[in-house]
Amino acid sequence: MVGEMETKEKPKPTPDYLMQLMNDKKLMSSLPNFCGIFNHLERLLDEEIGRVRKDMYNDTLNGSTDKRTSELPDAVGPIAQLQEKLYVPVKEYPDFNFVGRILGPRGLTAKQLEAETGCKIMVRGKGSMRDKKKEEQNRGKPNWEHLNEDLHVLITVEDSQNRAEIKLKRAVEEVKKLLVPAAEGEDSLKKMQLMELAILNGTYRDANIKSPALAFSLAATAQAPRIMTGPTPVMPNAALRTPAPTAPTLMPLIRQIQTSALMPTGTPHPTATLLPQTPESGIIYAPYDYPYALAPATSILEYPIDSSGVLGMAFPTKG
């Protein structure tokens, strides 16, 4: 109907689509933003990146997209601040990297959790800082009291009491999922984090196609018909062979003498003097170079034939 807007289906949250969005954002950030003309584009791009990452994250942890985050009641009462600590089981799993699992590459996993739950998620306590020397220097200083505690995740939220309790409960459930170690090779969240890190570094490649050159060659092979050809014979290079003898051979002269010595009836002319029969009389001299001495001689059909039926000279001679 007229006036209705056509709603297009949103692209599926795939790693390739996320990589395209990341590349677009990187390209847009490199362009000069005169008078804020890209503000709306940047906002839409950030929203799409957030949607794709959210769907991929939910598919990874829950198996399907969770829609409960938008189901919040209306605010009732004043703003309240709630918080809860979840201690990391580092004593039970001393070799497991819980901090990297919670934060993700460049903090993307923690930011995704914050966007979904509406809570502030921070890693605190011993071992929460990457720089161990800096952690020891800050221990005991003001605002660094948490370094004296065991490693934990601090979840805080500010909202009305009824809404804050729902948000905090959801955040605690999501963080508890991250505190359960997965077997090596079966950690889907870790695979997603490594994929995101490769996208950010520009080193992500599709696992189905190893390289663009290989994909192009496979497509060309599938479309082009296959032609079976026989083996190519090994022959000497024709360009290196002398196209014609460098000097006239004795064959035309012998044929001319033999023809003139015969009568019309086929009998020898009485006045004709035939060449004496010597061992050298049957030799035809072909002056080829030594490397081509074993090559077959040029066929006599390559020489011109005059009107009398006698083979002509290979090269014209001066009369």
Curated annotation (Swiss-Prot):
Location(s), subcellular: Cytoplasm; Nucleus
Keyword presence, Transcription: no
InterPro entries per the UniProt record, alphabetical: BBP-like, KH_1_KHDC4/BBP-like, KH_dom, KH_dom_type_1_sf, STAR_dimer
Protein's GO biological process: mRNA transport; negative regulation of macrophage differentiation; regulation of astrocyte differentiation; regulation of mRNA splicing, via spliceosome; regulation of translation; skeletal myofibril assembly; spliceosome-depend formation of circular RNA
GO molecular function: mRNA 3'-UTR binding; mRNA binding; SH3 domain binding
Family per record: Belongs to the quaking family.
Functional description taken from the UniProt entry: RNA reader protein, which recognizes and binds specific RNAs, thereby regulating RNA metabolic processes, such as pre-mRNA splicing, circular RNA (circRNA) formation, mRNA export, mRNA stability and/or translation. Involved in various cellular processes, such as mRNA storage into stress granules, apoptosis, interferon response, glial cell fate and development. Binds to the 5'-NACUAAY-N(1,20)-UAAY-3' RNA core sequence. Acts as a mRNA modification reader that specifically recognizes and binds mRNA transcripts modified by internal N(7)-methylguanine (m7G).
PANTHER family referenced in this protein's UniProt entry, alphabetically: PROTEIN QUAKING-B-RELATED, RNA-BINDING PROTEIN RELATED
Protein name: Protein quaking-B
